[in-house]
Amino acid sequence: MRNIAIVEDEDSATALLKGYIEKYAEKSGQQFNVVRFKNGVDFLEDYQSTYSVVFMDIQMPQRNGMSVAFDLREIDKTVSIIFVTNLSQYAQKGYEVDAVGYLMKPVSYYDFELKFRKALDVYAMNEEQKITITVAGGFCRISTLLLFVTVICV
């Protein structure tokens, strides 16, 4: 089961995305656990590196989603980010945080499915290069590219 975060202050936009995720799950036979955050501050405070995809609104109270995405990249370089907004002027900036996609509201299912499938594929490719270990208080994902193995022969 993959964990999906929706960072969105509008209830109607959240309901639409959840419905699309459920529809995609039915069509693909995959299972998703969806967690919603009403603002970016709560999202970052509660963030755990267990999300595969983050749907991020840009225009939100307290902090805009673009600045939240920059902070997210400081703690998780592999999670797939999809911006969902009605502000097209931020599309170019999304490349700076390696966003997988940019969906304009109101979101059509066709556009959603294309971006969501791509986000899952990108995340899966990144995950193939990581291992998960148990640490005090939870789990930690480590890139296998950063691991050095020491073999001691007696």
Q: For the regions a protein language model found, what residue spans apply to each?
A:
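CheY-like receiver
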Residues: 45, 51-126
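Conserved acidic carboxylate
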Residues: 8
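Residue-level signal for beta-strand positions within conserved beta-sheet cores that form or flank
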Residues: 30, 77, 129
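Non-catalytic signal-transmission and effector/linker regions of two-component phosphorelay proteins
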Residues: 1-3
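Two-component/phosphorelay signaling modules centered on CheY-like receiver
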Residues: 11-35, 74
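Acidic, metal-coordinating helix/loop segments flanking the phosphotransfer/catalytic sites
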Residues: 33-53
